[in-house]
Amino acid sequence: MSKLKIAFLSYRSDPFSGGQGIYLKNLCEALVKRNHDITIFSGEPLPDVPHSIRLIKVETPGYFETFSFKERFKIFKEKNKTRMEYFDFLKTSTGIFTEPIFFGERLVLNEVFTKEAHTFDIFHDNQSLSNYPEVINKRLATTLHHPIHVDRDIDLDNEKDFF
């Protein structure tokens, strides 16, 4: 098998909880063992990966690091007020989990990504709901870890009757 240059895109990659960061770490380590060149573009929290995997931080606001409106507003006030920042903050304020939605827009603002996007053989989107530019879409694979509607149906099927 020929060596591929693969970019993993992950809006958050917590190395210790949830499945995304753990899945990302394990898959990337396995691909490096097969001699592929791996770069991860991730928002915080960042994954805990060996130095053989290149890790590029994508700036994200961190609104979901707190559930306090006051703290979220403090984060927003410190941001450069772009159209995206206003939309992100307003949608977050209404309870929408915006990180996977706006990650693609934040990614294309990343200097390393902008400079190197054309050099990757394939992009692997790890659970985002982003609209990506054409440079990505033609070479994109996506992993959806657990569709929320499936989780809901499983939960409801396993609930005892309310009455």
Regions found by a protein language model. Name each.
Residues M1-T60, H118-F120:
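N-terminal subdomain of nucleotide-sugar transferases
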Residues I6, D121-D125, L129, E134-D153, ...:
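Active-site proximal beta-strand in glycosyltransferases
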Residues F16-Q20, S93-I96, P100, F163:
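Aromatic-acidic/polar surface patches that form glycan- and anion
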Residues G21, V49-R54, T66-E71, V135-K138, ...:
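Short aromatic-enriched loop/helix-cap "lid" or pocket-rim segments at secondary-structure transitions
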Residues K25-E29, V112, Y132-E134, L156, ...:
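Short amphipathic alpha-helical segments and helix-helix/interface helices
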Residues F41-R106, N110:
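A conserved catalytic-core segment of Leloir-type glycosyltransferases
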Residues R54-E59, A141-T142, E159-K160:
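Short, hinge-like loop/turn segments at secondary-structure boundaries
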Residues T98-N137:
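Extended amphipathic secondary-structure runs
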